[in-house]
Amino acid sequence: LPLRAERMRPFYRWLRRHNRRVFLGAFGMDRYWVKAGLDCQTFRYSDFNLGSQVRQRADNDFWIAEWLHGEKGRLNTYIAQDCDGIVAGLYEYDASYRKEFADKLRFIPFPIDVRRAPLIADFDKTDFPAERPVRFFVGVQRDRSSYKGTDVMLRALRRLEAERPDEVQVVKVENVPFEEYKKAMLSCDVLLDQLYSYTPAMNALQAMAQGLVVVSGGEPESYEILGCTDIHPIVNVLPNEADVYEQLRALVDHKARLPQLSHESRLYIERYHDHLKVAQAYLDFWQSIGK
């Protein structure tokens, strides 16, 4: 509901009274995500910390004020303590809630309708043309570029493009309608997504369903929580420009691997994020809570 947190509490209480089971979704910015990032221990890096150092940013100050010291955070705590179950959609959100709510927490991956995801133009090719440049896609949201690390990733990519202009092609879109964004993405091989994440989020997951190779968070924890041991299609990058550059350079140096990574990306989504499998997991969790 587009209401202030203090006005939403009565709505939650009404829902609680009129439903046998109530669940909280841990899918994005909330008190426990902010708290975990700021403790500088739960994550090696996140939107809020790099190692033992808190990232000093105006937008983080805003989130801290809202979620740690404001009514949003108090409402979040109240619902988390009162609800019957909590669903975490990414490893990061699971880790954020697990310390306090392990007994009612369930990790269920984000859903992707794989069948409706259009494939990139070269998905069916088994060999990458030796003479063709690798096409990198970067979507920029001006107000979130620095927060999500797009600025750092783009600098590394531009450096590689300047050094190897015949082997690297950059497709950059900025603040465009979603349909135009999707069309531009389909002409590319590799998507650059978030720098400070352990896992691919919705934008990257959708791209993987379409056969793009994703440069984002692919830490071991993200595979372990899924039980994924045989494929590792995500190009994991550490949150610094030097590592991003090295990973991008390796993709260009070994571009013959791109078709395999493309197919593994699609397989990853089919296995772990298929919307019907996810729906069944929600139903199973709901039914497991007896009331």
Region annotations inferred by a language model:
Residues V213-P220:
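Short hydrophobic beta-strand element within catalytic cores of glycosyltransferases
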